[in-house]
């Protein structure tokens, strides 16, 4: 697909926390969404030529896009970053902003935003 359409943005709920920084409790290695094989898949996907736009611009920021409805997780910020805007490598230098709208409370997930500065 990337050969036919080299400039891709693939956004959505991947249901995986890629790195320890993406989950409130990195000791949860045996829980679906943070299993080693899921994290390996995500790493392989990124290595295939995609950029995690949020992490590219926010290397140290610990923010989440999902909170369980149980145990008052959102109020206690016990979240997971499961939602991604993956950008193909040719668009990497076009990423101008990437952020999470964590104040939006319409769902257990909140919106993510990526802004690309593309010259037409």
What spans do the regions from the language model cover?
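Surface polyanion/phosphate-binding segment centered on an Asp-His-Pro turn
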Residues: 99-120
């Amino acid at each position: 697909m990337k050969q036919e359409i080299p400039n891709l943005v693939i956004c959505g709920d991947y249901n995986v926390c890629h790195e320890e920084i993406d989950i409130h409790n990195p000791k949860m290695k045996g829980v679906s969404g943070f299993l080693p094989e899921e994290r390996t898949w995500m790493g392989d996907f990124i290595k295939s030529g995609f950029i995690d736009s949020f992490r590219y611009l926010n290397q140290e920021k610990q923010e989440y896009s999902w909170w369980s409805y149980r145990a008052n997780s959102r109020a206690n910020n016990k979240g997971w970053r499961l939602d991604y805007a993956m950008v193909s490598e040719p668009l990497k230098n076009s990423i101008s902003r990437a952020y999470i709208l964590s104040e939006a409370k319409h769902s257990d997930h909140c919106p993510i935003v990526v802004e690309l500065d593309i010259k037409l």
